[in-house]
């Protein structure tokens, strides 16, 4: 197994701000743990951003989805989609930033890492973009450590449900804490 990559899923204002309809109440705790992990993965960090699908490219249910959430139907350059300060030093240090108009980011991640990587996954929302990235990655042969205390769900109940589901996929997926990763990232 190759050296692990840290993946920070969607650390953006839209998912972190308390005044955002999609703001995670669990983000502050996850953010602190992400900040702790970032220096450990210098040169091997991927940061993802969710951006809305372009109006002419909304296949199938994406049109209905964007109609249901009009506050998020904005230009991808809107400050609502900006990454948060916690990841800016990593970006300045060379972290790869990938954008995707989908919940899952596996396709964009594997384009950076190559096939069958070891991923240490953090971010928001555990019950949406994190799980939608982790399960296809596991299916493709990636080894994944989901850092439970560095992920933020849309609610505590949804967080636990998503972690329970991802925990059903050993050995492809294991659930670890920030402390576990700091002791031994592999």
Predicted segments, located by residue:
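Short acidic, Gly/Ser-rich segments with clustered Asp/Glu that frequently serve as metal-coordination loops
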Residues: 12-18
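Active-site flanking residues adjacent to catalytic metal/cofactor-binding acidic residues
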Residues: 9, 48, 148
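A short alpha/beta connector and helix-capping loop motif
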Residues: 2, 6, 19-51
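Acidic-leg catalytic submotif of subtilisin-like serine proteases
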Residues: 6-12
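Active-site loop signature of alpha/beta-hydrolase-fold enzymes
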Residues: 14, 53, 153
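Glycine-rich, phosphate-binding/catalytic loops in enzymes
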Residues: 23-26, 63-65, 137-139
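Active-site-adjacent betaalpha module
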Residues: 1-5, 33, 40-43, 69-186
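Acidic/polar short surface loop at catalytic or gating sites that assists cofactor/ion binding
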Residues: 54-74
